[in-house]
C-alpha cells in the first residue's frame, strides 16, 4: 500500500489553471464541516489516503483546487448534506431571517429566494416564529464566508430574546445614577459650556 500523500496548498477556484488541468484533477466531495477544517484525512477517488494540512482560517469552497506534495491536484466539491432551506417570495421576511441568523453568527448560505443553514431545532422554531417555512433536505451547503471567518456557533441554550435582553442590561447599567464632573470618563451630548466658532 502506498504512503499517504500530504496536501498543503490551495488554489482558490483553480485560478490561473487551464481547464484541461482542472478536468484531470481528482474530485473530492466534502461536507461543510470538513471544508471548514484545516487538518483532516480523506481517501481520494483513486484509493490513496491523503492528509490535509491547509492554511488556518480558510474555508474550502466548491471548485477550489488542492495541490499535494507529489503534484497531484484535487478538486473540491460541496457534498450533499442535511440542511434546512428557508424559502420565500417575500424578500423582506427573508431579510429578517438573515438578520437574526447573522446576529447569532450562524453560517448561512444566501441564494435567490432562499437561505440555507445546518439543522438546528432552536433556529427552526425562530424561523417559524418569523412566519417562514423551514424545509429539511439533502443539498450542498455553501455558506457565506464573511467577517466572522470560519463560522463559529453560539450555544442556543439562550433564548430567542437573548440579544434584546443583553442590550437592555447594558443600557440599564449605563443609566445608573452617577455624578458628572471632572472625573466622569464618558462624553455627554447636549449640555456643554464652551462657545462654538461660526
UniProtKB/Swiss-Prot annotation:
One of its GO terms (cellular component) is cytoplasm. Keywords: Chaperone, Cytoplasm, Nickel. InterPro entries: UreE, UreE_C_dom, UreE_N, UreE_N_sf. GO terms for molecular function: nickel cation binding; unfolded protein binding. It is found in: Cytoplasm. GO terms for biological process: protein folding; protein-containing complex assembly; urea metabolic process. SMART domains: UreE_N (SM00988). Residues 176-198 are annotated as: Disordered. The keyword Glycoprotein does not apply. Belongs to the UreE family. HAMAP family: UreE (MF_00822). Involved in urease metallocenter assembly. Binds nickel. Probably functions as a nickel donor during metallocenter assembly. This is Urease accessory protein UreE. It comes from Polynucleobacter asymbioticus (strain DSM 18221 / CIP 109841 / QLW-P1DMWA-1).
